[in-house]
């Protein structure tokens, strides 16, 4: 590892996104709104609250015009957030996360367009059909052949359902025990109580 790579290996999702946002030419207010959205992402990279709710929390006012303006700024900032890496970040649910990634593949020409379109249609259906791998019902919903439906399902399976996962610091989730018991020889020392299991 190079020193830079090692430092980035423990970079948080928030830091990663904020670093990318520095290259965007934004007004001070728009930069603040984007930062606010980034800081409200969960560990998986999802935005759990609605833009309206976030705007109300930030505005501190009941003035409808100010709230509408702030919601508009949040909408623009969310589009910018969706343009950052990892693809799918800022989604408000699994279906949207998958759709963002599929649209990215489509724009970059990294997958056959007809398969991506079928996958997008699948993601617009109730996701329990996909989870159950209900090919017949997905074929009906998409109007695609079995082969194309299966190809679309395979494409979806390759996507990252939790785009923030690689940034979660595993070390912070380690539980340190209060007591560690080790065996010293064949017998417990005389000063320790007997434990029966």
What positions do the PLM features span?
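Duplex nucleic acid-engaging cores and interfaces of nucleic-acid transaction enzymes
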Residues: 2-197
């Amino acid at each position: 590892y190079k020193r830079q790579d090692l430092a980035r290996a423990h970079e948080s999702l928030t830091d990663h996104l904020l670093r990318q946002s520095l290259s965007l030419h934004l007004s001070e207010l728009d930069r603040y709104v984007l930062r606010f959205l980034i800081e409200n992402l969960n560990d998986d990279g999802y935005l759990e609250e609605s833009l309206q709710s976030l705007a109300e929390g930030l505005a501190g006012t009941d003035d409808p015009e100010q709230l509408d303006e702030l919601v508009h700024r949040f909408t623009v900032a969310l589009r910018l957030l969706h343009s950052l890496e990892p693809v799918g970040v800022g989604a408000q649910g699994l279906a949207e996360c998958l759709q963002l990634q599929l649209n990215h593949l489509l724009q970059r020409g990294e997958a056959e367009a007809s398969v991506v379109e079928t996958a997008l249609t699948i993601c617009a259906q109730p996701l329990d059909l996909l989870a159950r791998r209900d090919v017949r019902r997905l074929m009906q919903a998409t109007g695609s052949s079995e082969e194309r439906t299966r190809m679309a399902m395979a494409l979806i399976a390759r996507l990252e359902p939790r785009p923030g996962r690689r940034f979660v610091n595993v070390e912070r989730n380690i539980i340190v025990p209060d007591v560690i018991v080790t065996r010293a020889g064949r017998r417990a020392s005389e000063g320790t109580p007997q434990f029966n299991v």
